Amino acid sequence: MGAAVLEVPLAGQGLRSAAGELVDWRVSCFREPAGEALLDAVERRVRGLIQRFEPTVVAIESPSGVRLQMSPALGGLVARIRSAARGAGLRFVAVSPAEVRKRVCGSETATRKEMAEKLAERFEGLGRYCEGVGEVRIPVGRREGKRESYKVSSWQKEYWGPMFAAVGVGYAIVAGFE
């Protein structure tokens, strides 16, 4: 699970930039098996982030219908995050992946790597994580007379991808306040 916290100045203070300042970004890993224990752990983590950062909005990237059909537990996860937000009296927003890409890159068809690069340009400190998103290719060897084959570094993609997705969602929400 990726999480990002963006800060937007109050009305009248003026925005230094279109998307405020990135206060925190992180990746949370859970060891609990799928089921109630995992849902409880995610909800506790979200409540902890809400207490620590006192946001005004909790936003997620909305899962597509296909992903919800393939993983019924995903619907439960979204419900738990929504419950944590509403329990704290906060607005809960789900943004489609296409809308996130459009607001970050100007195109609904941008790749994860393009989105990561745009966010790294905007937010200092994220550039070093770009290599872990999208098209990282590692040679896995070649046979005589054959082209070299590559594979995506799955641990980097799995680890940093959610963090960039979370920052992208935050950016998209803040950009919507303009």
Where are these regions (language model features)?
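Phosphate- and other anionic-substrate recognition elements at nucleic-acid/protein interfaces
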Residues: 1-178
